[in-house]
Structures are given as structure tokens and as C-alpha cells.
Amino acid sequence: MLKKIIVICLIAALALTLVGCGATKAKKEKFVVTDNMEVVEKQVEDLNGDGKTQKVILYGEKDDQGMPVWTLVEEEYEIVSLDSMEGAYTLADINLQDVDGQKGLEVLFYRYNTGSAGGQGLNIYKLDRGEWQEIFNVPNSFDMGKERFTMQYMGNYQVSFKDSETGLEHVIKLDPSRYAGNEEMLDGISTWVDPIAEYKLEDIDSDGVSEITTMQMVIGIAHADPIASLQTTYRVKDGSYQPEKISLVDISGMVLVEKAL
């Protein structure tokens, strides 16, 4: 009888040990700074809104092809590492800002293209119960929009525009006076939509939460000839930013067509 009791106790102890092991979380590995890295930017702020400050550092280095890679670190732990998208981005910086209206600050991680289109990338990260979550990330395209959009000159100073992703379409009317002496170039208008070059963060409805609007220029006969802008608005839903609407806006700021997403 005593032997049976001892065996039962040993089995119970082993079971508790195994359960304990299964519930243990793996420890985070500390970020290792190498000789190839340099500090691009460092900020010290109260991220949680609890009166205690944290250090956020953006490191930069070059990969095997000589392209920049940036790593975002909070204290001694990596948040994320982003590359240059095959050379599309050459510069980067960070900004700490409360965008979702909750207690604390989010990290806005910007990357920049230094070409004439001025493309930008933006990823936003939020510290939630000790873990970093990405709450905003919109892919940016540097192919002049040819995979997604279709543009064609229709004659009579009109350009058809269609977005295959959202179904948004419109006929853009041009101002004839802008093309005096260059009318022959109008037939050359084809698909040309710049990458996202601006992110407008604004609390549109005054609820304490910032909406984000991305801005892309729609190009006519040359890059110096924008004929409209494509603006997509994102709103926080279920903890992250989701697209709400897309608008085609003329160069005077008037909305030509809008579609809910």
C-alpha cells in the first residue's frame, strides 16, 4: 500500500513539473549591436504613460549588397528590422506619438526614397502588455502603379482612370490652358501613379484617435504635371488601422469620386 502511495505521489509531481515547463515562456534574446551598425536616431520617452521612460533606438547597417537595413530596438530588445525594398528607401527616422488615443505613445517608423517621386514608407508599432504589435503597414509600390491602375488619354482633354483593386474609376478632365503648345504630348499619357509620398495623421472626427490618409500623385504628360491625387483614409478598427475610403481628388482639392472600402 505504501509503495502505491509513493508511486502516485511521484507521478503527480512529474505531471506538475511538465505542466510548469509547458507554461513557461521563452525568454527574449537581447539585441546584439555589431560593429557594422550605427545609431540613426535615439529617443527616450514614457511609452506606457506610467511615468517610466523607455529608450527607443533606430540602428542602421548595410547588407551584403550594400543596401541599408534598419533595426528598431526598445531598451535591449528588437521590435522589427526592415530593409530598403531593393534600394527603394535610402533614409529612415522615427517619431513617437499617441495616434490611437489610448494611454502611451506609438512608434512611427518612416523610410524615405530620395528620388523625384519622394516615396515614403510608414510602419506603426504599439506596445501592448509588454509585447510590440504592428498597427499600421501599407505596402508601397514603385512600379508607377502599372500593376494596379489603368490610365488612358481619351481625347478632348480627358483621361480615364481605373483602380482594379478597389473598383474606383473616373474620367479626369484636364485644363486645356495648361497644355497650350504641348497638345501633341497628351496622346502619350498612360498609367503613372506615384508611390505614397505623404501620410497625413489627423483626428478628423475629434474622437481622440488619429485617422491616417495616404497621398499618391496621378501624373499626366510628365512628372511635373500632376493631374489628380489618390487619397486613401485608414481608421482604427479592432486594434489596427483598416482602410475606410479611397478618393480621387483634383489638383484644386475637390473630390472627384469617392468609394467606401
What residue ranges belong to the model's regions?
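N-terminal, intrinsically disordered, polar/charged segments of Gram-positive cell-envelope systems
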Residues: 7, 22-46, 68-70, 77-80, ...
